[in-house]
Structure formats: C-alpha cells, structure tokens
C-alpha cells in the first residue's frame, strides 16, 4: 500500500489577488503533488463554506485559518491512509469536519487536500490524472464555453448578465474549436475598439464594455463570428450565464432599469432564443425561485440547455430534488461548491444517470492549477467552462486539454 506520509498547506494568491489555499501531499513512495483551490465571486447560498480569516490582513480575505486546519487537523486525520482510496480519504475529512458544508474546517481546506491526494496518486501510478479518476472510459474532450463578454459580478460595467459565451460545436477536434473561438475573440476586440468601447477584461478574460442593454453583446458577438469567417448557428452557438440570483429582489428581477416577473423574464429569453442561436442559459432564474424554474423548464427545456449553478451548487441532494421536480436539464460542476473530489464525482454520476448534461467549471478567482481540465475528461462531462483565451489562469486549462488531445480522446462537437 502507498500511504499518505505528509500533508502541508500554504497561503498563495489567486487571479484576483486574493489569498487561497495550496495543499501539498507527499506519499510513502516519495511522490509529491500540490493543488490550488479556486474561489467564486457570484456564489450560491447553499455552497460549501469557504473559510476566510475576516481580520485586517488582505481586507479580511486571508485563509490562514484554513491553512492551519490543513496543517494541524486534516494532516493528522489522513496521514497513514491509502493514497489510492480517494473515497476513504474524502470520507475521513467529511467526518472530521462534522457538518454538511464544511463550516468547521472550510471547503477550501478540504478540497485542496482532496485534489492534491488525487494528483499524487495518479503521479505515483505514472498515469494521467484524467485516466486515474475516470478509468478506461475517460475519452471525451469537452466543448468549451468561452466567456468573451463579461458583466454582472464579474465586471464593473453596465451589463446585467454575467457572461456572454460562444460554443464552437462545428469542428472535428478540440484544437480546431479552440482556434475558432480565439479568432472570434480577437475579432471582437477589433470591433469593440472600432466602436470606441473599452477592451478591458473582466475576471474571466472576457471584455467588459459599457453597452446599452443585454442584447447588444449578442449582436456584437454575432458580428465577430461572421467577420472572423465562421457560421453562426452551425459552427458557433451562443450561451448565457444570467446569474439571476444577483438580480432577484423582492420577488422580481431587476435589469435594464425595469422589473420583471418570472414569467416576463422567461418571455424575454424566448424572444432572445428566436433571434439568436442560443444553446445554453445558465441560472436563468434565481436559486430561490423554484416555481419559476419549473415554468422555465416547461417552456424552454426542450429547446435550450438550462443550467443550474447557484440552483444546484454541485450538491447531490439538491440536484436529486431538482430531478424529482423536473427543474432544469443541466448542472454546472464546480468542485469547490461541494468540497471534495468524491462528492463532485457523485453529483456528476447522478446527473448523467438522469439525463442531465454536466458542464465542468472554473471560478472567477482561479490559478495556474488545471485540475478541472483533467476532471472534465475523466467524467466525460462533454462541456467545460473556463473563460476566454486571454488570461494565463484560463489558458492553463485550455493548454492542458490540448495536451490531453494528443494522448487520447474524441471531440464531441455537434454530437454533444
């Protein structure tokens, strides 16, 4: 048996300059691996708890408490455990914490160790991480969702919707899809410059111009697709992350200076879907508006991918409730929403068994760690959301997927 010999954590910085946890695990055969935990800006109410220090350091965002929990509590609990038994390691940390949302140890402490253990085990066996976690069936390169215009909580601008994305479906390989999306991104920059708009970027690498309404980004992106030489609809489809929980106040949705009921906002989406080839809408309604979600799914669920992010927070129990109530038809997968590799895998398997699509996702606060690229292939999610191709912490994931493409795997494209 190869066992966990040592565990250590440190405070490092994420892409927004905020502290986060880096965990390092050393195994009895000398193998060592690390992992860095991401952090979100727009977060669901029921996410696992991210432990912050709330003192004078880093405006209260330090993570020394989480680091201390790794070094003083988690290390003692997992040292000596079988490194190849991920489920047992994660179960030990969950039991040690004693809560359903890691409010004692911090999900950022637990996830760092969970990821580092998986990475160390794969390295010890001399196999890729995606193969270790997914086995022989890990073979699908995901269709990327490229966030090329940012708004909402991810940007300081006038756009309400949080993300406007392109999805390159009509290509035979991941590398061809990546090239197309990148060329469209650069064309969009030229169009924005020519129109006198800012080309400053948001947290996830997309541009963050001040635009008149939430339809103008769709018009500009459509123009960029065509001018870059690609076909909108057949090769490139569009996707939205509305992050509508951020817009929901007193039972109404406030955007573009107006107030919308759930039914009115659904009608607004229907009109957008008639005008543009929108494949996916994420968090179209608030995480608290389940009756609205039922209506949204009834009206658009057969035509559009309806993704629950804040709605489901990668939580198996909440997803099960959504499945029973016919809410949404897809789930965003963010490991730090639930807290461990094992729990993430359990949620994905439940979704896939019930016909829900899965989208592996980054957070707005990221790092050079590309764990989710391997994770997406391991779980055959078929889709990945990890920003524009303009910031190194985003490109780390795309570059890892390019490496995986050389080793194995097929690109789903239109067969998603």
Swiss-Prot record:
An example Gene Ontology CC term for this record: extracellular region
Residues annotated as binding (2R)-2-phosphoglycerate: 162, 334, 363-364, 385
Keyword annotations: Cytoplasm, Glycolysis, Lyase, Magnesium, Metal-binding, Secreted
Record-given protein name: Enolase
Homology family: Belongs to the enolase family.
Cofactor comment text: Binds a second Mg(2+) ion via substrate during catalysis.
E.C. code: 4.2.1.11
KW Metal-binding (keyword) present: yes
HAMAP family the UniProt entry points to: Enolase (MF_00318)
Function as written in the Swiss-Prot or TrEMBL entry: Catalyzes the reversible conversion of 2-phosphoglycerate (2-PG) into phosphoenolpyruvate (PEP). It is essential for the degradation of carbohydrates via glycolysis.
Organism lineage string: Bacteria, Pseudomonadati, Campylobacterota, Epsilonproteobacteria, Campylobacterales
Catalytic activity: (2R)-2-phosphoglycerate = phosphoenolpyruvate + H2O
GO molecular function: magnesium ion binding; phosphopyruvate hydratase activity
GO biological process, any: glycolytic process
Pathway: Carbohydrate degradation; glycolysis; pyruvate from D-glyceraldehyde 3-phosphate: step 4/5
Superkingdom classification of source: Bacteria
Record SUPFAM superfamilies: Enolase C-terminal domain-like, Enolase N-terminal domain-like
Membrane is among the record's keywords: no
């Amino acid at each position: 048996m190869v066992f966990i010999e040592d565990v250590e954590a440190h405070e490092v910085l994420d892409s927004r300059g905020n502290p986060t946890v880096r965990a390092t695990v050393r195994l009895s055969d000398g193998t060592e691996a690390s992992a860095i935990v991401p952090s979100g800006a727009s977060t669901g109410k029921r996410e696992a708890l991210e432990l912050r220090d709330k003192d004078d350091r880093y405006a209260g965002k330090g993570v020394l408490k989480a680091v201390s929990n790794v070094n003083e509590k988690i290390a003692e609990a997992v040292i000596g455990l079988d490194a190849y038994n991920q489920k047992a390691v994660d179960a030990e940390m969950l039991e040690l914490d004693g809560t359903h949302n890691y409010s004692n140890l911090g999900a950022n402490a637990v996830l760092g160790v969970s990821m580092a253990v998986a990475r160390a085990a794969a390295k010890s066996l001399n196999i890729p991480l995606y193969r270790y976690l997914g086995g022989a069936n890990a073979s699908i390169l995901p269709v990327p969702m490229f966030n090329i215009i940012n708004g909402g909580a991810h940007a300081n601008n006038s756009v309400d919707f949080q993300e406007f994305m392109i999805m390159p479906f009509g290509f035979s390989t991941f590398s061809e899809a990546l090239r197309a999306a990148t060329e469209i991104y650069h064309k969009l920059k030229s169009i924005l410059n020519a129109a006198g708009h800012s080309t400053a970027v948001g947290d996830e690498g997309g541009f963050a111009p001040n635009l008149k309404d939430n339809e103008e980004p769709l018009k500009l992106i459509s123009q960029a697709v065509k001018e870059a030489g690609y076909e909108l609809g057949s090769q490139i489809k569009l996707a939205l992350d509305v992050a509508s929980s951020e817009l929901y106040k007193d039972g109404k949705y406030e955007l573009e200076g107006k107030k919308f009921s759930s039914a009115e906002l659904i009608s607004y989406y229907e009109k957008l879907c008639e005008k543009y080839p929108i494949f996916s809408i994420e968090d179209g309604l608030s995480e608290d508006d389940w009756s609205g979600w039922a209506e949204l799914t009834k009206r658009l669920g057969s035509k559009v991918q309806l993704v629950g992010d804040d709605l489901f927070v990668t939580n198996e129990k909440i997803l099960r409730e959504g499945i029973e109530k016919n809410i949404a038809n897809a789930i965003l997968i963010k490991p730090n929403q639930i807290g461990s590799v094992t729990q993430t895998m359990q949620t994905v398997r439940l979704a896939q068994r019930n016909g829900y699509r899965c989208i592996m996702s980054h957070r707005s606060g990221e790092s050079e760690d590309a764990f989710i690229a391997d994770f997406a292939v391991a779980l055959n999610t078929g889709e990945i959301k990890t920003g524009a191709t303009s910031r190194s912490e985003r490109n780390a994931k795309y570059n890892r997927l390019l490496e995986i493409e050389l080793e194995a795997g097929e690109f789903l494209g239109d067969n998603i």
